């Protein structure tokens, strides 16, 4: 009986291990919906909006003896194709451009982190939101429709593959 239980436990653990490493617990790099925040210092209202960003698992390796060999570049989930969209911030004073542009992921891939165009930092536990304002007019800002401003750009990577606030001055 113990042999049968041991065999059953071994089968469950081996199948479970394969499922966990390739299944839904670690989704591969792909576009996902994310909520971002846009604000300008001169405009009184911060807007949150939903766009698609690149996120997910990219296979990687860490050397067992890192001092003996050079570091291996770790792939990150980043844009393969993207387009840009814009939103209008309400309440901006005259002379301040109320438009804010942001990337929309069309497709993603695992590739090297390009520090010039991508936030290569750590994953954020909490979604970013608008900074607290002293004025009560900034509470519960209205959601703004998205407007496309350009065509898809193959191979371009302009912004972070992690949710970031879009803040311009």
UniProtKB/Swiss-Prot annotation:
Subcellular location: Secreted
Secretion signal span: 1-20
Keyword Zinc-finger: no
Glycosylation sites noted in the Swiss-Prot or TrEMBL record: 33, 138, 143, 147-151, 153, 157, 160-161, 169
InterPro entries tied to this protein: Cystine-knot_cytokine (IPR029034), Glyco_hormone_CN (IPR006208), Gonadotropin_bsu (IPR001545), Gonadotropin_bsu_CS (IPR018245)
SUPFAM superfamilies for the chain: Cystine-knot cytokines
Organism superkingdom: Eukaryota
Keywords for this protein: Disulfide bond, Glycoprotein, Hormone, Secreted, Signal
Cellular component annotations (GO), alphabetically ordered: cytoplasm; extracellular space
Gene Ontology biological-process annotations: G protein-coupled receptor signaling pathway
PTM notes: Microheterogeneity at Asn-33. O-glycosylation appears to be responsible for the beta subunit contribution to the difference in LH-receptor binding activity between LSH-B and CG-B.
Residue numbers spanned by region Disordered: 131-169
Function noted in UniProt: Promotes spermatogenesis and ovulation by stimulating the testes and ovaries to synthesize steroids.
Protein family (similarity comment): Belongs to the glycoprotein hormones subunit beta family.
Protein's name according to its UniProt entry: Lutropin/choriogonadotropin subunit beta
